[in-house]
Structure formats: C-alpha cells, structure tokens
Amino acid sequence: MAFTIQPRQSLIVYTYSLKQTRQLKRYGTVMYVSKKMRYVVLYVNREDVTKLTDQLTHLRFVKRVVASSRPTINETFNGVAAEMVTTTETEDDDE
C-alpha cells in the first residue's frame, strides 16, 4: 500500500460574523481566521472544491467563497530575471 499525497486547495470564506467559524471545521481544515477582515482560510481536497463551494455559499453566515488560484500559477521562475532585464531595456529605448 503506497502513500499518495492528497492534492488540496484553499478556499477563502468571507463571513458576516466569526461566531460560526467552528462550524467550518466540518468542511475542511481551518488554517487561519482573520478577526479584522472576517475571513477564514479553509483547506479542502481538490476534487471536493466545487461541491464544498456550493455548500458553503448556502450557509447563512457566509458572504462569499473564493477558491485560491495557487494551483494554476506557474511556480518555476527560471529565466524570469532575464525577461525582466529585456523588458526594461525595451521600455528605456522607447522613451
């Protein structure tokens, strides 16, 4: 039996009140709670994101749910510095 890493994604849940944040533990792992801005960062399995987003939006204390875009962002930065140098040189030539 081989161990496989479960792909996970974060959901940012904006709430009207933080009194019900304990209820969000049913849906995933609560990683962070912002008291000032009233949002909760919740980690869930990636295959359950759409189903849980629908369930969370129907809760009375939830304003909106935003899925994190981190899985779609390219995290390899090879050649980024070279690209920035060439773009700044072309911008300087235009002026």
Swiss-Prot record:
InterPro entries recorded: DUF2129
Record-level GO cellular component terms: cytoplasm
Domain of life where this protein originates: Bacteria
Chief site of localization: cytoplasm
Subcellular location: Cytoplasm
Keyword terms, alphabetized: Cytoplasm
Pfam families, per database record: DUF2129
Homology family: Belongs to the UPF0298 family.
This protein's name: UPF0298 protein LVIS_1401
Species whose genome carries this gene: Levilactobacillus brevis (strain ATCC 367 / BCRC 12310 / CIP 105137 / JCM 1170 / LMG 11437 / NCIMB 947 / NCTC 947)
Lineage, uppermost ranks: Bacteria, Bacillati, Bacillota, Bacilli, Lactobacillales
